[in-house]
């Protein structure tokens, strides 16, 4: 059975497009599970946010200085960190369908950053495509923030 092979191969969980866990066991509309999930996902996110900010500062410095080699290095480091973050997100066992869906959107947002980095690394960067992805990323980021805030509000109803 192909499905069993996919589940047993942990290497397939590396890409952000492959949900690593079955959703059949997830709770729906359970404030306590949402609260738990937000805590464990938040723990993964906090460390990564600091690293991402540092990487972004490195990219900004490289852009401002016009140093193409420094920019390439910064983009590659950022891409590696984003892949690592997506893997860490996948490694977290969540209990609620709502936070599981939010995690997938976080990974999609991260993948937009990777695509933007790939454009920067290309020999002839497509500025229009980069601008489109940047807008899409900004919108995705806002939507995830709204969704996470709604989940935090729901989680606060848990006793």
Show the residue positions of the predicted features.
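Sec-dependent N-terminal signal peptides of Gram-positive bacterial secreted proteins and lipoproteins
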Residues: 1-2
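Mature extracytoplasmic domains of secretory-pathway proteins
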Residues: 72-109
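C-terminal amphipathic alpha-helix
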Residues: 9-75, 105-159
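N-terminal propeptides/low-complexity segments immediately following signal peptides
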Residues: 5-6
């Amino acid at each position: 059975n192909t499905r069993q092979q996919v589940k047993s191969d942990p290497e397939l969980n590396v890409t952000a497009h492959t949900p690593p866990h079955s959703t059949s066991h997830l709770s729906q509309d359970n404030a306590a599970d949402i609260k738990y999930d937000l805590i464990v996902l938040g723990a993964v996110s906090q460390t990564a946010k600091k690293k991402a900010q540092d990487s972004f500062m490195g990219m900004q410095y490289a852009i401002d200085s016009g140093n193409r080699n420094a920019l390439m290095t910064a983009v590659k480091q950022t891409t590696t960190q984003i892949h690592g973050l997506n893997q860490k997100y996948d490694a977290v066992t969540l209990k609620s369908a709502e936070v599981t869906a939010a995690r997938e959107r976080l990974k999609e947002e991260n993948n937009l950053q990777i695509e933007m980095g790939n454009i920067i690394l290309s020999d002839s960067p497509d500025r229009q495509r980069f601008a489109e992805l940047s807008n899409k990323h900004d919108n995705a980021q806002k939507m995830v923030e709204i969704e996470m805030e709604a989940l935090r509000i729901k989680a606060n109803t848990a006793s």
